[in-house]
Curated annotation (Swiss-Prot):
Record's bilayer topology term: Single-pass type I membrane protein
Keyword list, A-Z: Cell adhesion, Cell junction, Cell membrane, Disulfide bond, Immunoglobulin domain, Membrane, Repeat, Signal, Tight junction, Transmembrane, Transmembrane helix
Cross-referenced Gene3D superfamilies: Immunoglobulins (2.60.40.10)
UniProt name for this protein: Junctional adhesion molecule 3B
GO cellular component terms, A-Z: bicellular tight junction; cell-cell contact zone; desmosome; plasma membrane; protein complex involved in cell adhesion
GO molecular function, one term: integrin binding
Protein encoded by which gene: jam3b
Amino acid sequence: MALTPLACVLLLLSMQCYISTLAVLLKSTNSKPWVNEFESIELSCMIESITTTKPRIEWKKIKNGDPSYVYFDNQISGDLERRAKIREPATLVILNATRSDSADYRCEVTAPNDQKSFDEILISLTVRVKPVVPRCSVPKSIPVGKPAELHCLEDEGYPKSQYQWFRNKEEIPLDPKSSPKFFNSTYTLDGEMGTLKFSAVRKEDAGEYYCRAKNEAGISECGPQMMEVYDINIAGIILGVVVVVMVLLCITVGIFCAYKRGYFTSQKQTGNNYKPPAKGDGVDYVRTEDEGDFRHKSSFVI
């Protein structure tokens, strides 16, 4: 007796259901979960069908292509020891996720009594890390018309942080032309690198600047830093140069005059310049015509 098409369909469905009841089948409610660092996360591994009463359940962590056990022989091991547990029948719960937990995890179930005795599912976990306080660099003072660069950087956040700059608590837009307050400013803002560059600062650019680093896990800010913008006093600079030149000129003339008057010459009383002292203690007597022939030339001291 030939089977009708409806009977064939029913037969195929019944055979499929019979085979399914003899096979272990797994599924997950979320194959790409994410969690913020230090929070809990479930890696869902649900057994849809199985006939074996006590299947073997294993979890492996795969990072950089290298698998390692995190649940084996009914015990948490490896990187998750004392930080995870199994929720029946096979879901892995990480209690305190850290950034090193970002990896692929494979749930494996072996059921010896089932016709299809093995199944596995792969789950990719991402642990998001909040940015730390960024390192900010703001020049303290810049003359009008000169270029200036402000830098902001942090390297702990995951995914990679994006950056915002603020002046006097107001966000600086990426495009200065999009805001009336910054319309005349000549700057470029790189939100990925955290740099704010002025090609020529104006007086209006002075103020308190701070930077914010943000990603999906949170935000962090550095403290405000003051940047002053001052005018260059050309007249004062010229006057200062003139005063310095005049002072140097006066010193030079004074030294020259002193040299000409002999203040810098010295005579040594030695050698050919030595002059013997005059005779003050001796007396020469020479007889004059009135004194006759007497002549006394001896020098004697009274």
